[in-house]
Amino acid sequence: MKKIALLLLAVVFSFLFVFAENAAPAQKPAEKRALQWSKNPATKIIWKEAEWYCKNIKEDGYTDWRLPTIDELRTLVENCPESATGGTCGISETNNKLTINDYNKETCRGCKKGRMKLKGKGWFWSSSQRTDTDHYWVISFNNARISEAKMIMAYNVYCVR
């Protein structure tokens, strides 16, 4: 009788294990998977709307979208080493460099041939707040320029996960 009960338990647990494994796709932690960007940007919205939009977007079966950091936006820069990740523009959430003292108009001005890996024109919001005001850091998809903006300005947004 005990053998039958143990065998029955083993079958039930095996079934549960297989069911749980197939029920939902495993997701890698954010730091171990490549960034996934939303397919199309939302246009001309203020910062609070951009934050709300990214928290509520449902795309490709995912609901864990968010507003990107300035560092994540900088990974999209092409042909402008100053604004690209690790470039001389000092603005970086990763390095805790988000004040006006970290900003240098010369090194953050972008490049004539600077462009972004995603489509779009104009300024794009980040989730990175300038730590000494209520302004947020933004990046231009026209020339990879990095600047700051008041929350009431209307800019574009790509979401990331």
Give, region by region, the residue ranges found by the protein language model.
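Positively charged n-region of N-terminal signal peptides that target proteins for export
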Residues: 1-4
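Bacterial N-terminal signal peptides
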Residues: 7-16
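Extracellular adhesion/carbohydrate-recognition regions
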Residues: 20-65, 156-160
